[in-house]
Amino acid sequence: MLPKIFKPYKSIKKNLIRVGPNTDGGYVIDKRVIKKVKTLISCGLNDDWEFEKEFLKINPYCEILAYDHTVNKKFWKNRFKKDLISFFLLKKLRLRKILNIFKYIDYINFFKKNNKHYIKKVVLKSKNKKEISIKKILKNKKNILLKIDIEGDEYKVLEPIKKNFQHIYLLIIEFHNIHKNIDKIKKFLMKSKLKLIHIHGNNYSGINKNKDPNVVEMTMLNSEKFKLSKNKSKFKYPIKDLDYVNFKRRNDIELRFND
């Protein structure tokens, strides 16, 4: 079972909305923040910006800033080769998969003007030009929606996130290998003004021997900017019609909490 502190605070269901696809890359947020967000910052991009695209449709006035050092020219060359081989081996016959071969065109079209992708690694303290600190990313920005999926490095940037909470309206964060880092997550949840309003187990990474997910997606709301119940949620997770599996060939993970 997951620790009691992993159970979200009570939300009015009509305030919860899913943004992005009904699969991996979609997240549940509080819709009250949408129109108030001025900057959406994504740390960790890979080849998926569907969340950012849909968010921009709802709030066309916000800027999108993405940081990912792995998405470079080499990344796109390798991806195109792989997709092309799959196509000729008849592994990409569905229209969506065929269109994915030309994902780079979508990337070029999306990341322009107010939408920017920086080929930099997100770190606690930068040591060279290829890195950028989370503190610098957040500097001089207000009304932020911060989305973090940096494959285990999220634990290194929790402290500056906690200290700069006043500028962050909503935090979406994926915690990896949670059982090895459970105390770090608990400490962050206890001391942060960003309060947990939603949790989902990412079924891509499977479960441990106790049937708990190895990776969780958490959504946290700034409790000083938005009204939030002091009571814990009574929802069963995953929430029907809000949560969807990341990997369609596996069942979603039912979450259980220590009460």
Which residues fall in each region the model found?
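SAM cofactor-binding core of SAM-dependent methyltransferases
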Residues: I12-N128, K141
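A short acidic, often aromatic-flanked loop/helix-cap motif at beta-alpha or helix-coil junctions
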Residues: L124-K129, N203-I207
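Preference for solvent-exposed, low-hydrophobicity sequence contexts
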Residues: P3-K7
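Conserved acidic-Pro-Pro-aromatic motif
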Residues: T39-I41, F51-A66, K77-N78, I134-D259
